[in-house]
């Protein structure tokens, strides 16, 4: 696949905010996709002054690894909470462009609508690629939620400024929840179902585990 940004890299903070507002206006929050046969885990981290992105494509629902790519790109945007897409997305887009298989769904290690301006990396990547996308984060960026039952699959809305922006989801009993939010072309309820379908015996979905292992260890867990 050959995704590309509809805006230049880099941008300054003022431009970044305008871009986020424009992307947010394009986010589709209902189910708008065909059959999902492949799902890609997306993760990005930092090495010195570079962003390192890893993407692993898994068959769905078997979760067998089919394709992967890594990309490194010089960081040109400052570290500002709420604007990390502008540091990470260029490298992720490079990795996506290197794939042999175009995934049917992106599952990002980060947020979608659960973001101060409702435009986390899952929204950014979903709109730029026009692929259905989900944010599945390890911690809260914005919002709060009610206590969550200690039962696999239990979830409760994540609310911010009187708006439901995502969900706290218990993937396993006895572990901290993950935080699921809409990225693009997927409803929140469906996003939760996809995350649970990608969870095996660990807290995190296999998409996240595979991309994180590829980025940090250079291998995909079996």
Curated annotation (Swiss-Prot):
Cellular component per GO, a single term: cytoplasm
Site (Interaction with target DNA): 79
Catalytic activity, reaction form: Endonucleolytic cleavage at apurinic or apyrimidinic sites to products with a 5'-phosphate
A GO MF label: RNA endonuclease activity, producing 5'-phosphomonoesters
Entry annotated with the keyword Hydrolase: yes
Pfam families: Endonuclease_5
Highest taxon, organism lineage: Bacteria
InterPro entries documented for this protein: Endonuclease-V (IPR007581)
Main location per the UniProt record: cytoplasm
Cofactor field: Mg(2+)
GO biological process, one term: DNA repair
Protein name according to UniProt: Endonuclease V
Enzyme class: hydrolase
EC annotation from Swiss-Prot or TrEMBL: 3.1.21.7
Sequence positions that bind Mg(2+): 43, 109
Protein family per UniProt: Belongs to the endonuclease V family.
Keyword DNA repair assigned: yes
Its job: DNA repair enzyme involved in the repair of deaminated bases. Selectively cleaves double-stranded DNA at the second phosphodiester bond 3' to a deoxyinosine leaving behind the intact lesion on the nicked DNA.
NCBIfam families the record matches: PRK11617.1 (NF008629)
Species this chain originates from: Roseiflexus castenholzii (strain DSM 13941 / HLO8)
Keyword line: Cytoplasm, DNA damage, DNA repair, Endonuclease, Hydrolase, Magnesium, Metal-binding, Nuclease
Compartment(s) where it occurs, according to its Swiss-Prot or TrEMBL record: Cytoplasm
């Amino acid at each position: 696949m050959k995704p590309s940004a509809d805006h230049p890299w880099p941008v300054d903070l003022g431009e970044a905010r305008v871009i986020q507002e424009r992307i947010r206006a394009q986010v589709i929050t209902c189910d708008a996709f065909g059959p999902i046969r492949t799902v890609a885990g997306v993760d990005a981290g930092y090495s010195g002054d570079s962003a390192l992105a890893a993407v692993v494509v898994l068959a769905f629902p078997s979760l067998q690894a089919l394709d992967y790519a890594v990309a490194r790109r010089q960081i040109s945007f400052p570290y500002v909470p709420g604007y990390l897409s502008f540091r990470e997305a260029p490298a992720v887009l490079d990795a996506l462009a290197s794939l042999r298989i175009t995934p049917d769904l992106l599952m990002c290690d980060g947020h979608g609508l659960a973001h101060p301006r409702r435009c986390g990396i899952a929204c950014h990547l979903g709109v730029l690629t026009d692929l259905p996308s989900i944010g599945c984060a390890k911690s809260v960026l914005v919002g709060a939620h009610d206590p969550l039952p200690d039962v696999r699959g239990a979830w409760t809305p994540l609310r911010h400024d009187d708006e439901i922006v995502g969900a706290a989801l218990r993937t396993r009993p006895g572990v901290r929840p993950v935080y699921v939010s809409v990225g693009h072309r997927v409803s929140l309820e469906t996003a939760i179902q996809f995350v649970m379908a990608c969870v095996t015996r660990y807290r995190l979905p296999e998409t996240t585990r595979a991309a994180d292992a590829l980025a940090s260890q250079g291998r995909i867990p079996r």
